[in-house]
Curated annotation (Swiss-Prot):
Subcellular location: Plastid, Chloroplast inner membrane
Primary residence: plastid
Function: Contributes to K(+)/H(+) antiport activity by supporting proton efflux to control proton extrusion and homeostasis in chloroplasts in a light-dependent manner to modulate photosynthesis. Prevents excessive induction of non-photochemical quenching (NPQ) under continuous-light conditions. Indirectly promotes efficient inorganic carbon uptake into chloroplasts.
Entry keyword set: Antiport, Chloroplast, Hydrogen ion transport, Ion transport, Membrane, Plastid, Plastid inner membrane, Potassium, Potassium transport, Transmembrane, Transmembrane helix, Transport
UniProt-recorded name of the protein: Potassium/proton antiporter CemA
Protein source organism: Pleurastrum terricola
Amino acid sequence: MQEKIGLIPRSILRTLDRFRKQLFPNQETKTITLQEFQVSRQQMQVSVVTFLTLVLVPLGVNICGKTFLVKPFTQFLWNNYQTELFLNQFQAQRAFTEMQEIEDVLFFDSLIQNTNFCFNCSKAWNNYFVMQPSSYSSNSNFVIQKPDLANSQSKNSTCHNSKLILQKNVFEIYKFSENTDFFKDKMYGEQIHDGVKNSYNEFSSKASNALSNLEAPLYLGSEASLPPKLKNFDSRIFTANQLNRDDKLIYMSLQEQPLVKKQNFLDKYQFAKHETQENVINKPEIYKIEGLLQTSEKDEMELRQDKLVALAIQYNEESIDAISNLIGDALTCITITFLFFGLKVQILILQSFLTESFYSLSNANRSLIIIIVTDLLVGYHSPQGWKLLTQLILQHYGFPETKLFILCFIGTFPVILDTIFKYWIFRHLNRISPTTVLTYHRMIE
């Protein structure tokens, strides 16, 4: 049956009829309006409940499952049935880099704490000197010099402000405050190049005329008065052989200028006993210093071991967390799948509510939202964000951070998303709201 065509279009008649009902509502109009409001309210309530269900239920399953089931089981298997610490070589590389940073920090702290090399002793020492390396290498020369004598030298001397620094010397000599109880034990001779209990570096001494203008012998730690002035003597220069960064220097106490003689063909020297004085090294006090050195080195070693053990525990927990994240997220995906099958009607209502809310916006607002989303996901600056996101996901699941995989993912996945957006704009948005598409293209241009 063919419908009659009137003089006035039907759309105008329907608009006038709707306008009349709003101006002069009857009981039927009020009932329809109330029903529409109730339907809209119920739709919003169902949409909110469905959205919260889709978010909170999988999140709760993930947290509770990993905390009470997955992680304890994974931790038990990982710590008892295998010996590996890392899941992949990239995780091991990060651990080794952090380990090197810890070593650098500990070495820097040791340089700051041991500036004066005073063994952390509360007593100050009188007329005794400590050689502190600032930037040394093997076969570095250093000269033992008394500050009292250094202050009395001429301007041509190499002594300045109670310090002695030669051209090839990287050591500085310091004087401590007065205390006469430190070296009060009887002193007796000991060969320097043999060391004490084989705990110190081998030292050799040789004659040098580097300080021939001095008028008194090089002299350490005497509790008596200065010896008679001598002229034209040779200063004593000690050379530390095979000196490493962690080595400590011998703390020596010399009371008189000892004579030096060659011991054998290996050019090793030893101090010969003086006719009037036999004291060269205070052996009991050297033992005390040896104990302090061993204690200091033991503390440093224990601190280093504690740091490394904490680092190993951290990366072991990271491996366990990665496996737990993989299993827990798999449970989350299964939960979401069941929710989608069980809440089909509610999800349709939620979809209708979101669509209606989106299309109720103005054309400019819709275009702005589309531009923000597309620029974040497939914009010109998005590759760095995708790279960071990919690395975080791989670390989250303990997968190797292969550069080839990351580059391939960044080069393909944003392109696929861009194609999907363009298809949606052309297929659906252009049919539902052509003005929005026009506004979108104008804003891009």
